[in-house]
Amino acid sequence: MPQNMTASHTPELLAEVAALPAMPGVYRYFDAEGGVLYVGKARNLKKRVSSYFQKNHGATRIGHMVTKIVRMETTVVRSEAEALLLENNLIKTLNPKYNILFRDDKSYPYLKLTAVQPSEAGSAPVATAFPRIAYYRGAVEKKHRYFGPYPSAWAVKDTMLLLQKVFRLRTCEDTVFNNRTRPCLLYQIKRCSAPCVGHVSPEQYALDTANAERFLQGQTQEILTELERKMLAHADRLEFEQAAELRNQMSALSKVLHQQSMEIGGDKDVDILAVKVQGGKACVNLAMVRGGRHLGDRPYFPTHVENATDVAALDAQADEGAGGGGPESDDRAGKTVVPLPARPAKSLEALVLEAFIAQHYIDVPVPPTLVCSEPVDKDLISALAAQTGSKITAIHQPREQRRIWLDMAQKNAALQLARLLAEQGSQQARTRALAEALDLSLDNLDALRIECFDISHTAGESTQASCVVFQGHKMQNSEYRRYNIEGITPGDDYAAMRQVLTRRYTKLAEAARNGNARLPDLVLVDGGKGQVSMAREVFVELGLDLGLIAGVEKGEGRKVGLEELVFADGREKVYLGRDSAALMLIAQIRDEAHRFAITGMRARRAKVRVGGSKLEDIAGIGPKRRASLLQRFGGIRGIASASAEDIATVDGISKDLAEEIYRALH
């Protein structure tokens, strides 16, 4: 055991360190409260762990950590690959204070192509015979095809739009497909071939589907060659209409390829990783190339960067062994051995990047090529390859197209980190936190638009809905709208929500399809599953993206800070956490919607009640009958629009009195 052990540790702990085997493994340090301080791996546990206790580290971060260690746990493993996997699983699970930690991100989105189940000959088209493309996140079903992963939801939806334009595949849900009697708007704008009403044969649709799969796999040139051959064959047979269809498809595909000229690299699947460190913060920008197409990028911001730096450096020194010192004697051989010089210490950027690679690729498929802005430890790549069972190459100084990709990733990492530093402690930080939590686009947070709806009434009287707008990191008061709700059963909040969403988005959806308007990035409804289900029905009817909808559900006991988000597209509920910046923004927007709704409702109710004095002027109408009438018809306007027969159906109102009320209000 080393002589210079720190005196602040118990003999039992020091004895445990001295007894460690010289084998690969993972170690954990704990403080007096049982909190995890650090998780590390080592190819030699005895050598690595002893290095922490061999000297006094002073007032450094390592010194502060070491003085807090009261307990240690170790796990011996068979290989470095196994140690890598265990270490990073523990880091994600235990959230140690002195490890560089990347947030355990939600599962990546995929593009889903549903399975085919042929229909009977001569029968009407059925949805299962015509695969649909869809945005998907969750557990994979083997019967369907999945393409990805994609860096963000918008990358999936952008790809879906390309497939609609070029191959005209359907995106509608099966229930909508099976109940269509005529083509929808997507057919009119040439983004669907209308298989729902038999405008395309199953054979032709299957061919379009196969070409779409090849496009996603990067076989674009092969598709163009085949389409050209078929077009010429149709022209030779004087089938000019079919030839024109293929020409248009080739033109659409060529336009897509021209617009994405940056994606013409020869690589099929590559991840580009760039890191930037500044001001005690770090950003790793991950750009993804799949099937030869650049799908966009995604920033990651680790925590504990400053704490972990010195500790990681000490680990690296321990791995290098004795180096750079004087000659050592070897008594067994009777000769002097000069140690190899130690390799240069790793930069902070390299430490952050290696932490990202080790943690990120535990649950995410690893492409065969990683293009990195910093040199990556060969042992890490070897362990990752052993873990995945496939060959992985890490390239530090790329050329040609890869160089362009890496330069772009480095610029984006710098921009994202600069933006993060500028936004900290501000409303922008809340916006970013919400966008990250809900997988919204981070490219232009200034343009992120959220619309929130709330319903307000008093026992069914004077029902009013509000819509408030958040954009540019602030509430946009000039865009607030109130909707008087009519023609529903008083107190039916679900019907009120249906009415306001229908009125709000019917024209807006049409304008958005024509490029004359922009839909919000997120639609919040104040309520849980019931309100979200109602919003889902409206959006399905209007052909809008269900991924836009989220409901704010009260937590247990309706306590503030326990709210959960409920989604219309089938995603699991999300609990953001009591102190979450994202929840603070959600609460701010929801409370503003509630305030705007309730003030409008009170003003409307006051007007109704002033008008309600007309009822009390009618002989036979007292407070009880007046309240019954207002509750039944929602206000004086509802009573005025009712017939005498309808008024007579209210308890306590006779036919003669109903006719008197009708005459008084007309």
From Swiss-Prot:
Gene3D superfamilies: 5' to 3' exonuclease, C-terminal subdomain (1.10.150.20), GIY-YIG endonuclease (3.40.1440.10), UVR domain (4.10.860.10), UvrC, RNAse H endonuclease domain (3.30.420.340)
InterPro entries to which the protein is assigned, alphabetical: GIY-YIG_endonuc (IPR000305), GIY-YIG_endonuc_sf (IPR035901), GIY-YIG_UvrC_Cho (IPR047296), RuvA_2-like (IPR010994), UVR_dom (IPR001943), UVR_dom_sf (IPR036876), UvrABC_protein_C (IPR050066), UvrC (IPR004791)
GO cellular component: cytoplasm; excinuclease repair complex
Keyword Transmembrane helix: no
SMART domains registered for this protein in UniProt: GIYc (SM00465)
Domain annotation UVR: ranges: 221-256
Domain of life: Bacteria
Main location per the UniProt record: cytoplasm
Protein keywords: Cytoplasm, DNA damage, DNA excision, DNA repair, Excision nuclease, SOS response
UniProt record, GO biological process: nucleotide-excision repair; SOS response
GO molecular function, one term: excinuclease ABC activity
Entry annotated with the keyword DNA-binding: no
PANTHER family tied to this protein: UVRABC SYSTEM PROTEIN C (PTHR30562:SF1), UVRC/OXIDOREDUCTASE (PTHR30562)
Function in brief: The UvrABC repair system catalyzes the recognition and processing of DNA lesions. UvrC both incises the 5' and 3' sides of the lesion. The N-terminal half is responsible for the 3' incision and the C-terminal half is responsible for the 5' incision.
Name of the protein in its database record: UvrABC system protein C
The species this protein was found in: Polaromonas sp. (strain JS666 / ATCC BAA-500)
